[in-house]
Every structure is written in structure tokens, then in C-alpha cells.
């Protein structure tokens, strides 16, 4: 029985700690959620433009190298 308890105790402690953490956390309010969503959208747009311009620059360079 002691071996069984020693095996189960870490999982039980982890579940108790996880439950306590979730109960302590708070959901973001509407203003905070909109701020996070806007920052994420701006980040996606910036990364998209960077990828587009890199592709735009490398297409002519690739055509020069392959076409030669």
C-alpha cells in the first residue's frame, strides 16, 4: 500500500496545485482582451509584410541566378 501511495501522491499534489492556480487566475476583461487581440493582429500583419517583402526581393534574385 505504501508503494501505491508513493506512486499516486505526486499526481495528487500536482492536481491540487493546478486546481489552486486555476482558481487564483482571473480572466481578462473586455478592454484587456481587445488590447491583446490588437497586439496579436499587428504582430501577424508585420510578420506577413516582412515575409512578403523578403519573397518579393528574392524572386528576381532567384530568376537571375537560375536564368543565367
Curated annotation (Swiss-Prot):
Membrane topology type: Single-pass membrane protein
Subcellular location: Endoplasmic reticulum membrane
Signal peptide segment: none
Tissue: Expressed in the germline. Expression in the germline is regulated in a sex- and meiotic cycle stage-specific manner. Expressed in somatic tissues including the intestine and somatic gonad. Expressed in the intestine more highly in hermaprodites than in males. In hermaphrodites, weakly expressed in the spermatheca.
Matching PANTHER family: SEC61 GAMMA SUBUNIT
PROSITE patterns according to UniProt: SECE_SEC61G
Entry similarity comment: Belongs to the SecE/SEC61-gamma family.
Entry keywords, A to Z: Developmental protein, Differentiation, Endoplasmic reticulum, Membrane, Oogenesis, Protein transport, Translocation, Transmembrane, Transmembrane helix, Transport
Function: Required for oocyte development and ovulation. Required for the translocation of secretory and transmembrane proteins into the endoplasmic reticulum in vitro.
Transmembrane segment boundaries: 33-61
Ranges in the topological domain labelled Extracellular: 62-68
Side Cytoplasmic, residues: 1-32
GO MF assignments: protein transmembrane transporter activity; protein-transporting ATPase activity
Gene3D superfamilies: Preprotein translocase SecE subunit
GO cellular component entries: Sec61 translocon complex; Ssh1 translocon complex
Subunit structure: Heterotrimeric complex composed of SEC61-alpha, SEC61-beta and SEC61-gamma.
Protein's GO biological process: intracellular protein transport; oocyte growth; ovulation; post-translational protein targeting to membrane, translocation
InterPro entries tied to this protein: Prot_translocase_SecE_dom_sf, Translocase_Sec61-g, Translocase_SecE/Sec61-g
Main location: endoplasmic reticulum
Superkingdom per UniProt: Eukaryota
HAMAP family per the UniProt record, alphabetical: SecE
Protein name: Protein transport protein Sec61 subunit gamma
Amino acid at each position: 500500500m505504501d508503494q501505491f501511495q508513493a506512486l499516486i501522491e505526486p499526481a495528487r499534489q500536482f492536481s491540487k496545485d493546478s486546481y489552486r492556480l486555476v482558481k487564483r487566475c482571473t480572466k481578462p476583461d473586455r478592454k484587456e482582451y481587445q488590447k491583446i487581440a490588437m497586439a496579436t493582429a499587428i504582430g501577424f500583419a508585420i510578420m506577413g509584410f516582412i515575409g512578403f517583402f523578403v519573397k518579393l526581393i528574392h524572386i528576381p534574385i532567384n530568376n537571375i541566378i537560375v536564368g543565367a
